[in-house]
């Protein structure tokens, strides 16, 4: 990277293997980054900050290990490492403008990091530091970028998403304990069904979150295997045989996460199956969150003409024309986030099969979609917990009114009077808009006290077979 000043105050002239190029005077990047900026004016969206920070960690680890192996002067390595750690800390995020739709290997972003770090290190040493020969020593974009994706995705999941899910689970469980004795009408096919408690309903949501946490933790084990050291195609050409394993140890120390050197680096470059798997876990979580959000929307619907079982916290006016209207805005946001994450997974799935021969060539797309999914999910899960679950109120009068008039309670009489007789009672109760207990007293030979016991909604939430003269069994 050779630099000379142009006559313009706004630009300097940088040189790379393809010739001279004008670069903004204050930019820390060099010619290869500038070429990428000019080649890919596509979306206006640059690579995620977490990915850039991971590149910083990798360059810092590489400089340290190359110095220990005697491949890089210690003084130079020290300045490269310091500059790289500044990148990892997010101090130079604005210096990474390359579009996500770029070369499929992510080479432009890797060179962006190499050039910025070289410039910063040169400022400290006052001597020449080359982005390829020194900062990128022993590396290739083909092993650096897949490694950066795995590091940044792991940090995003462990640092934000998993803690958010744990918080949501705790809030759901807390509300379930507080509402444990409140019985409500269950629904299947959106139609009235047998009763259950709010604790049982919320418990199902909590179980979904527990399963999501377990799936994510299991997938992360495979993301911890880093292909750094495989260089161009997995053979490790132009790098010390000890570089990859030693650099991964340094990365573990820098991030606080136990990473391992991948046993098969060919797989780590050519196949991104573990990243597709992680995206699949995001997809599954999105489905779970959409189910929970839609349940909340249905339960909150009304307040007069819908189910109206719960009242969600009022966060903002819901209509520009209908005064007093308040909408379930957070559950709606959850649904939209879930929809976007499901779309991201489709993109990652298609991108994952683009590993022709020795290299996947859609790595920036995988990185962007994975990290955005993790960010969206982590943020919206916290909102769901703190702005919905914590503050929702149960409208017990409404819940009790509907419960008492639910003809499906007659299901408990099936073992005693038979399905057909029970159906007669249910249909009559529906038709006459009367409590099922009243109709059952008229249509059966059972006494009112026994019927009241058999049709007690709270007892029915415990399951079992309810018989005359006894409890559930």
From Swiss-Prot:
Single GO MF descriptor: fumarate hydratase activity
Looking up Pfam families in the UniProt record yields: FumaraseC_C, Lyase_1
Protein keywords: Cytoplasm, Lyase, Tricarboxylic acid cycle
Physiological role: Involved in the TCA cycle. Catalyzes the stereospecific interconversion of fumarate to L-malate.
Q: Where in the cell is it found?
A: Cytoplasm
* NCBIfam families the UniProt entry points to: PRK12273.1
Identify the GO cellular component terms for this protein.
cytoplasm
Checking PANTHER family in the record gives: ASPARTATEAMMONIA/ARGININOSUCCINATE/ADENYLOSUCCINATE LYASE (PTHR11444), FUMARATE HYDRATASE CLASS II (PTHR11444:SF22)
The domain of life is: Bacteria
Q: Coiled-coil stretches, from where to where?
A: none
Q: What is this protein called?
A: Fumarate hydratase class II
Q: Where is this site: Important for catalytic activity?
A: 332
> How is the subunit organization of this protein annotated in UniProt?
Homotetramer.
Kindly report, in one word, the top-level EC class recorded for this enzyme.
lyase
Reaction(s) this enzyme catalyzes, per UniProt = (S)-malate = fumarate + H2O
One GO process term, biological-process aspect: fumarate metabolic process
Miscellaneous note, as given in the UniProt record, is:
There are 2 substrate-binding sites: the catalytic A site, and the non-catalytic B site that may play a role in the transfer of substrate or product between the active site and the solvent. Alternatively, the B site may bind allosteric effectors.
Q: What Gene3D superfamilies has UniProt attached to this entry?
A: Fumarase/aspartase (C-terminal domain), Fumarase/aspartase (Central domain), Fumarase/aspartase (N-terminal domain)
From the UniProt record, report the name of the gene that encodes this protein. fumC
Residues that, per the record, bind substrate: 105-107, 130-133, 140-142, 188, 320, 325-327
Chief site of localization: cytoplasm
Give the UniProt family note: Belongs to the class-II fumarase/aspartase family. Fumarase subfamily.
For this protein's source organism, the top of the classification is: Bacteria, Pseudomonadati, Pseudomonadota, Gammaproteobacteria, Lysobacterales
Annotated active site residues, numbered on this chain, are 189, 319
Listed EC numbers: 4.2.1.2
**Pathway stated in the Swiss-Prot or TrEMBL entry:** Carbohydrate metabolism; tricarboxylic acid cycle; (S)-malate from fumarate: step 1/1
Q: Which InterPro entries match?
A: Fum_hydII (IPR005677), Fumarase/histidase_N (IPR024083), Fumarase_C_C (IPR018951), Fumarate_lyase_CS (IPR020557), Fumarate_lyase_fam (IPR000362), Fumarate_lyase_N (IPR022761), L-Aspartase-like (IPR008948)
């Amino acid at each position: 990277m050779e630099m000379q000043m142009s006559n313009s105050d706004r630009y300097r002239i940088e040189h790379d293997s393809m010739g001279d190029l004008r670069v903004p005077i204050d930019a820390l990047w060099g010619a290869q980054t500038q070429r990428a900026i000019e080649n890919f004016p596509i979306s206006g969206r640059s690579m995620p900050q977490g990915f850039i920070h991971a590149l910083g960690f990798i360059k810092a680890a590489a400089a340290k290990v190359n110095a220990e192996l005697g491949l890089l002067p210690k003084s130079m390595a020290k300045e490269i490492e310091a500059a790289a750690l500044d990148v990892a800390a997010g101090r130079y995020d604005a210096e990474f403008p390359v579009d996500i739709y770029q070369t499929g290997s992510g080479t432009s972003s890797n060179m962006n990091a190499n050039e910025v770090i070289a410039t910063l290190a040169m400022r400290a040493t006052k001597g020449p530091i080359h982005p390829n020969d020194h900062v990128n020593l022993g590396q290739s974009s083909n092993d650096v970028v897949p490694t950066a994706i795995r590091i940044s995705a792991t940090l995003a999941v462990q640092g934000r998403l998993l803690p958010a899910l744990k918080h949501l689970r705790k809030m759901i469980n807390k509300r379930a304990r507080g509402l444990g004795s409140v019985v409500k009408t269950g629904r299947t096919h959106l139609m009235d069904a047998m009763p259950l408690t709010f604790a049982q309903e919320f418990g199902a949501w909590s179980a979904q979150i527990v399963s999501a946490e377990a799936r994510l933790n299991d997938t992360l084990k495979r993301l911890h295997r880093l292909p750094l050291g495989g260089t161009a195609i997995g053979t490790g050409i132009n790098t010390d045989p000890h570089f990859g394993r030693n650099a991964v140890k340094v990365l573990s120390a820098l991030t606080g996460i136990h990473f391992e050197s991948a046993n098969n680096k060919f797989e780590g470059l050519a196949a991104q199956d573990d990243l597709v798997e992680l995206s699949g876990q995001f997809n599954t979580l999105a489905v779970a969150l959409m189910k929970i959000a839609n349940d909340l929307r249905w339960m909150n619907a009304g307040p007069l003409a819908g189910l109206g079982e719960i009242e969600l916290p009022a966060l903002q006016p819901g209509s520009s024309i209908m005064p007093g209207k308040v909408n379930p805005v957070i559950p709606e946001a959850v649904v939209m986030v879930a929809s976007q994450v499901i779309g991201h997974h489709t993109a990652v799935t298609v991108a994952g099969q683009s590993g022709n021969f020795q290299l996947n060539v859609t790595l920036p797309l995988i990185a962007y979609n994975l990290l955005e999914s993790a960010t969206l999910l982590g943020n919206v899960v916290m909102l769901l917990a703190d702005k919905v679950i914590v503050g929702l109120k149960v409208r017990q009068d409404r819940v009790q009114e509907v419960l008492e008039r639910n003809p499906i309670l007659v299901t408990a009489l099936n073992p005693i009077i038979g399905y057909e007789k029970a159906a007669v009672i249910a249909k009559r109760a529906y038709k006459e808009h009367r409590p099922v207990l009243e109709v059952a007293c008229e249509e059966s030979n059972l006494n009112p006290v026994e019927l009241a016991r058999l049709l007690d909604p709270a007892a029915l939430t415990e399951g079992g077979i309810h018989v005359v003269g006894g409890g559930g069994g």
